[in-house]
A protein has these predicted regions:
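Condensing-enzyme catalytic core mediating Claisen C-C bond formation in acyl metabolism
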Residues: 1-49, 143-205, 284, 291-360
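Conserved beta-ketoacyl condensing-enzyme motif
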Residues: 7, 52-113, 221-248
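Active-site pocket-shaping loop/turn-to-helix segments
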Residues: 39-58, 106-113, 145-147, 192-213, ...
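Cys/His-rich short segments
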Residues: 348-414
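Short nucleic-acid-contacting surface segments enriched for D/E, G, S/T with interspersed K/R
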Residues: 447-461
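OB-fold/S1-family single-stranded nucleic acid-binding modules
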Residues: 462-489
Length: 489
C-alpha cells in the first residue's frame, strides 16, 4: 500500500508596507473618479530592493524553519513576473536557501494559476518538493489593477511522512484541471502592463462558467459534496464572486475563505497558495480544504487536514506577516520604486554595476547563501571564508568549514545613516554587525527607520536586491540586515 502524499509544511511572505488605497485614489481622483469604489483598505507593496525571487526566498525560509533542507529533492517557482527570461529563477532561490545541488528545479509561468499547477505537479510525485509562488506585478497608474493588486509570496513543501521532514499537515485527496484559452487579460513579453477585457464578460464566461463548472466537476470526480467542504479557497478578487460560486456548488457561506483583498490585495500566481497557507494555519484536524486556481482554465485541489495541521510557533506565516504591517501613504515613493516615475537621481547614481559572472560563480555560496567559514581548530567564525583564517593566533591553511550565517541573529556594533550616497530610499543605513556564535559583517540595513537602529539592536538577515545593472538588465543580489521584531524565530 502506497503512502499518502500531501503538505508537510507551509510558509508565507508579505512585505511590511501597506499602501493605503485612499492615498492612491486621492492622487488620481481628478483623472479617474470612478476608482472611488476601490479606495478602501490597503495593499501590500514591496520595497525597491524586493522582487519575485527575494520574496520567494523569504516565503521558503518561513516554510522550512527547523526542517532538514538536504531532504528536498526539487524546487518549483511559479510567477508571472520572473526577473529572468533565460536564467533559472528557481535556481537563484535554491542558491539562497543553500539547498543540495542534486535536485530538480523549474520555473512555472504564463498564467495566474501557475502556482496551483505547480502544486499539482509536485503532489503527483513522491519525493519532497518545495513549491514557491510569488508575484510583483506592475499596473498602470490610475488603473483598477493598481488598487486591487498586492505583492506577496507563499511556499508549500509537499511529500510523504517518513522522509525526514515531519508528518503531513494535510493529505492530498486529488485534483481536477481544465485548460481553455480564455483571455480575460494578457501581457506580452515586451509589455509592462496587463491588458484586460470587460469585467462582466469575465465574470459570466470565465468565473461562472469555466471556474464554476470546474468546481462542480471536481466535487463529483473526488466523491464529495459542497456540504463536505470546511474551507473553500476561491482566489477571485471581484466582490461577491467567490460566495456566488460556492453557493452554486452547495458550499456553506461560512466555509468561503477571506480573499485577503482588503489587507494584502490580489498577489497573482501566489494568491491561491497564500490563501491556502492562511487556511492551514486555522484548520482543524479532519477539515476538508478546497483550493481553486483560475487562469486560461482552472485547477481544483482537495486536501484533508491531519492532527499535525497548524502553524508552528517559530514561523510567521500569513497571520504573523499581517500583524507587522506598516501603513504607508507615500504614493510618489511607490511609483518611483515601481519604475513608474523617473526622479532626478544625480551623479552619485551613475555607477557601473556590472557583475562578472566568473566571480559570482566562484563566490556563489558567500554571495547568494551568506555562507562564511569556521576554523575547525580554533572555532573562529568569519565572513567571507578564506584559505587562511583571521585568527591572529593560528594562521593554518585549509582549516575552515562552511558556516551558514543567514539564519543567525546579529547585533549592531556600529552604524551610520548616509544621506550623501545614492539610495532609492534615502538615507541608506549600514553598519557592522556581530553574529551570535561569532562572525562580523558590514551590512546594509533594510526595512528600518531612525528609531529602529541603535547599537546592540538585534538584527536578522534577509535576501534582497543589492543593485541593478540597468545597462545589461542584470540584478545583483545579496543579504541585508533588518531589525528583529516580535515573533521572529
Amino acid at each position: 500500500m502506497s503512502r499518502a502524499t500531501g503538505i508537510l509544511a507551509f510558509g508565507a511572505y508579505i512585505p511590511q508596507r501597506r499602501l493605503q488605497r485612499s492615498a492612491v485614489y486621492a492622487a488620481n481622483a481628478w483623472f479617474a473618479p470612478g476608482l472611488k469604489g476601490q479606495s478602501k483598505g490597503e495593499r501590500a507593496i514591496a520595497c525597491w530592493d524586493e522582487d519575485t525571487v527575494t520574496m520567494a526566498v523569504e516565503a521558503s525560509r518561513d516554510c522550512l524553519t527547523g526542517l532538514d533542507r538536504t531532504a528536498i529533492a526539487g524546487i518549483s517557482l511559479a510567477s508571472t513576473t520572473l526577473p529572468y527570461a533565460d536564467r533559472l529563477n528557481s535556481g537563484l532561490v535554491k542558491e539562497a536557501l543553500c539547498l543540495e545541488t542534486n535536485l530538480t528545479a523549474n520555473d512555472q509561468t504564463g498564467s495566474l494559476r501557475a502556482g496551483t499547477s505547480a502544486l499539482i505537479q509536485a503532489l503527483n510525485g513522491t519525493t519532497p518538493q518545495l513549491v514557491v509562488a510569488a508575484d510583483l506585478r506592475k499596473a498602470r497608474p490610475a488603473s483598477e489593477g493598481e488598487l486591487v493588486q498586492g505583492d506577496a509570496a507563499a511556499a508549500i513543501l509537499v511529500g510523504q511522512a517518513g522522509q525526514g521532514l515531519g508528518e503531513l499537515a494535510a493529505t492530498f485527496l486529488g485534483s481536477h484541471s481544465v485548460t481553455i484559452d480564455f483571455v480575460d487579460h494578457f501581457r506580452s513579453t515586451s509589455a509592462d502592463f496587463d491588458y484586460g477585457w470587460e469585467s462582466r464578460w469575465i465574470r459570466d464566461e470565465g468565473h461562472t462558467k469555466i471556474l464554476g463548472g470546474t468546481l462542480k466537476e471536481a466535487l463529483t470526480k473526488l466523491g464529495v459534496t459542497g456540504a463536505d467542504i470546511d474551507h473553500a479557497i476561491i482566489p477571485i478578487a471581484v466582490r461577491g464572486v467567490p460566495e456566488s460560486l460556492a453557493k452554486s456548488c452547495g458550499i456553506k457561506p461560512e466555509a468561503v475563505r477571506d480573499s485577503l483583498s482588503a489587507v494584502v490585495g490580489d498577489s497573482g500566481a501566489a494568491h491561491p497558495l497564500l490563501m491556502l497557507a492562511a487556511a492551514l494555519e486555522e484548520a482543524k484536524p479532519g477539515d476538508k480544504i478546497l483550493l481553486a486556481g483560475f487562469g486560461q482554465g482552472a485547477d481544483v485541489l482537495l486536501f484533508q487536514a491531519t492532527d499535525s495541521v497548524g502553524r508552528p510557533p517559530e514561523q510567521l506565516g500569513v497571520a504573523g506577516h499581517l500583524a507587522r504591517a506598516r501603513k504607508d501613504t507615500n504614493y510618489t515613493r511607490f511609483l518611483f520604486h515601481r519604475g513608474l516615475l523617473d526622479l532626478e537621481k544625480g551623479m552619485r547614481a551613475e555607477m557601473d554595476e556590472k557583475q562578472p559572472g566568473t566571480s559570482l560563480y566562484r563566490n556563489r555560496k558567500a554571495v547568494m547563501g551568506l555562507v562564511g567559514g569556521r576554523c575547525t581548530k580554533t572555532g573562529t567564525v568569519q565572513f567571507p571564508k578564506t584559505e587562511i583564517g583571521v585568527n591572529a593566533n593560528d594562521r593554518s591553511q585549509g582549516t575552515q568549514e562552511d558556516y551558514p550565517l543567514a539564519d543567525k541573529i546579529a547585533k549592531i556594533v556600529t552604524y551610520t545613516a548616509d544621506s550623501l550616497s545614492f539610495s532609492p530610499d534615502p538615507p541608506v543605513y549600514y553598519g557592522a554587525i556581530d553574529f551570535e556564535g561569532g562572525g562580523r559583517l558590514v551590512a546594509e540595513f533594510a526595512d528600518c527607520s531612525a528609531e529602529d537602529v541603535e547599537v546592540g539592536r538585534e538584527m536578522r538577515m534577509v535576501f534582497r536586491i543589492k543593485a541593478v545593472d540597468h545597462a545589461r538588465d542584470f540584478t545583483k543580489y545579496f543579504w541585508k540586515a533588518v531589525p528583529v521584531q516580535k515573533g521572529d524565530a
